[in-house]
Amino acid sequence: MRFVLPKGRLLKPSIEFLRKAGVELELPNGRELVSADGRVLLARAFDVPVYVEHGVEVGIAGSDVVLERGSDVFIPLELPFGKCRISVAVPGERKRYPEDMDCFRIATKYPRIASSYFDSIGVDVEVMKLHGSVELSVRTGIADAIVDIVETGQTLRENGLVEVAKVMDVSALLLVNRIAQKVLFDEINELVMKLRGVLDEGA
């Protein structure tokens, strides 16, 4: 059974959580992305759901990227780390709330989530997808507001932005390939039970 784990902030807590459940994994060496035994793959967070949907048996990713990707995967567990939120933020000196953002240009790494949010409140906006620091888009005047991940809010404050609405809460999720869920039912079920045991201990 293979695991695809996200590079970046979720990697360390993912490994620690799996180890608490007795799942010992050999990690890739140095800059390598696949472990020597082929059981562990490291991928960009946004790509983890795609790998799981298309064949890697198990993965861990944030609920933000799973929703944004719209990947068809089985999600047996919400995990107790990676907690943050996706929010709407605007310049502090031009504070506006989402209901008043008709015709605004919104910069985001999450166009699907942002579009769905503004559609749900009946506000017509232009959503612009960016891959880098979306805060820069407002500072340079190419966007009126952003929709982005917020943990402490420090990055927003450093860029003169204020959070005006929460779009969704985010946490890490356990992802399982739908075919593997059936073909490797016993193995997958054993893994889920081990992880659930760790969750119950921490409750």
From Swiss-Prot:
Pfam families: HisG. GO terms for cellular component: cytoplasm. InterPro entries: ATP_PRibTrfase_cat, ATP_PRibTrfase_CS, ATP_PRibTrfase_HisG, ATP_PRibTrfase_HisG_short. This is ATP phosphoribosyltransferase. Pathway: Amino-acid biosynthesis; L-histidine biosynthesis; L-histidine from 5-phospho-alpha-D-ribose 1-diphosphate: step 1/9. One of its GO terms (biological process) is L-histidine biosynthetic process. It catalyses: 1-(5-phospho-beta-D-ribosyl)-ATP + diphosphate = 5-phospho-alpha-D-ribose 1-diphosphate + ATP. It is found in: Cytoplasm. HAMAP family: HisG_Short. Disulfide bonds: none annotated. One of its GO terms (molecular function) is ATP phosphoribosyltransferase activity. Catalyzes the condensation of ATP and 5-phosphoribose 1-diphosphate to form N'-(5'-phosphoribosyl)-ATP (PR-ATP). Has a crucial role in the pathway because the rate of histidine biosynthesis seems to be controlled primarily by regulation of HisG enzymatic activity. Belongs to the ATP phosphoribosyltransferase family. Short subfamily. It is an enzyme of class 2 (transferase).
